[in-house]
């Protein structure tokens, strides 16, 4: 899936996560992570985000994750929503998720 424009999903409320995604000139996923629990769960957060992006077919993007203690299911949903908005997709590919 090609990222066409900047988009975001989520909030900065407690137990949520804000995911910002935009196009990137360089190949690969460039991920920035800010989290209250980065020391403990930073690797897991990054792994979940990268897995979700891979399942959606995103190969090139700049992603900023600002986590406020979100559960894994919330993180996946926010990444999916941001990707759909950034790719200007209206049809959800349930098989990819």
UniProtKB/Swiss-Prot annotation:
Its main location: cytoplasm. Keywords: Cytoplasm, Phosphoprotein. It comes from the Bacteria. GO terms for cellular component: cytoplasm. InterPro entries: CitD (IPR006495), Mal_deCO2ase/Cit_lyase_ACP (IPR023439). It is found in: Cytoplasm. The modification O-(phosphoribosyl dephospho-coenzyme A)serine is found at residue 14. The keyword Cytoplasm applies. Disulfide bonds: none annotated. Oligomer with a subunit composition of (alpha,beta,gamma)6. Covalent carrier of the coenzyme of citrate lyase. Belongs to the CitD family. This is Citrate lyase acyl carrier protein. It comes from Escherichia fergusonii (strain ATCC 35469 / DSM 13698 / CCUG 18766 / IAM 14443 / JCM 21226 / LMG 7866 / NBRC 102419 / NCTC 12128 / CDC 0568-73). The gene is citD.
